Amino acid sequence: MPPVEEARQSTSAVSTGSDIPALPSKTMNGKPSNGHPPKGTNGATNTNWRRRSKYRHVEAYHSRVRHSSLSREPNVTASFLGFRNLMVIVLVAMNLRLIIENFMKYGVLICIRCHDYRKQDVVLGSALFALVPFHLYVSYLIELAAATQAKRIVGRKKKDISTEVNEREQRIFKNTWWISAFFHCLNTLLSLGITSFVVYFYVHHPGIGTLCELQALIVSFKICSYAFTNRDLREAMLNPSVESALPEIYASCPYPNNITLGNLGYFWLAPTLVYQPVYPRSSHIRWSFVAKRLFEFFCLAVFIWLLSAQYAAPVLRNSIDKIAVMDIASILERVMKLSTISLIIWLAGFFALFQALLNALAEVMRFGDREFYTDWWNSSSLGMYWRSWNRPVYLFMKRHVYSPLVGRGWSPLAASTAVFTLSAVLHEVLVGIPTHNLIGM
């Protein structure tokens, strides 16, 4: 048989039963080894080849061992980003439904003129807001007297370094500390006590009362930190040792050079509750940054007010009769309905205070350390959350309450319990006094 006839017969022997001619090329599993049509073929032949390879019913789709995406297998790493996006969409849709339902049921409840801003509240609130910082000046006078006494002790020790003189100076130092500590405590109690008394009995608007009480608490924290820190600075100056070594950052302003009104004034306005003679500073003020943060704060403050007036207030009013008759099912429904609104208000308030306002203040004061919070949203425990969401208060409690208690022999659990109790009392003061609703009273 001639070679041409033999080739034709072999070609027809592998026919697929269609009119598409077989392509004379090297194949692997019925396909060209390179996955493309053979070279040297025309356009019609290429189209026929692609059509035949596309509709092959013998393709091996199950060619390796695989697991389901949600299986708990060691080599399976599934991404749940789509579920997160779905939850965001559902959350937005549910809140839009609540907004529509609220407007259909109540209409527009926002009323600027309906707020009861009494003249007495405005006058007393303004007076308290202006006079409370005066207690910082009193603490400055106390520390100035203690610093003067410390300089005298250092001068006498340089003249006479005998043991008897050292013991006498140590007694003087301890007496000075106890006297200054007494006046600092009295000053702090007056700052917080007078403000709390006036707000509880004479200021009826909770917003004005909260601002006054918050400033009194901040000033009280700053007075305590100012007193404790300068006490240790005096100790380090009078008794220099390895144990009393100071941080290197303090070298540019040694004690008692830090006892000035300018130094205390900076601490008063700085966004921190922990006193240091020196803070890390930024090189310049970015006024555009300040404007953006203040704009964010203003917008979020208005947003919180709108949510409170339009959504939170009606739910609370409608809950009074349910609580009176102890309708448990209705109470639970109101609590869950209010929880969404409360969460949004809390998140907006957190961003407005810790991100917008404190960053704007830090920029104006050129305050460098702006870690006012960390990623509390990733907290795996309640303790981690407390340490993350409000860093200024956490650092104050750790430096002036927790660490001294542990240093005096308290167990970490007992010290943490003391910090928790003190924090709970102060939160009750901040919330209960302006709203005239102290627990147990």
What are these regions (language model features)?
Residues M1-T148:
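Noncatalytic N-terminal accessory/assembly modules of large enzymes
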Residues E5, S12, N29, N34, ...:
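Intramembrane catalytic core of multi-pass membrane enzymes that act on lipidic substrates
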Residues N34, N42, R51-N75, L98-C114, ...:
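Membrane-proximal N-terminal segments immediately preceding the first transmembrane helix
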Residues N48-R50, V198, Y202, I218-S220, ...:
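A broad "ordered helical/assembly scaffold" signature
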Residues S79-N102, E213, I223-Y226, D232-V242, ...:
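Conserved, structured core domains in eukaryotic proteins
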Residues M87-I99, S126-L141, F182-S196, C212-C224, ...:
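Hydrophobic alpha-helical cores of multi-pass transmembrane domains in eukaryotic membrane proteins
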Residues L96-G125, L144-K151, F173-I179, T195-L211, ...:
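Membrane-lumen (extracellular) interface motif
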Residues I249-E296, N318-T435:
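Membrane-interfacial catalytic/cofactor-binding modules of polytopic membrane enzymes
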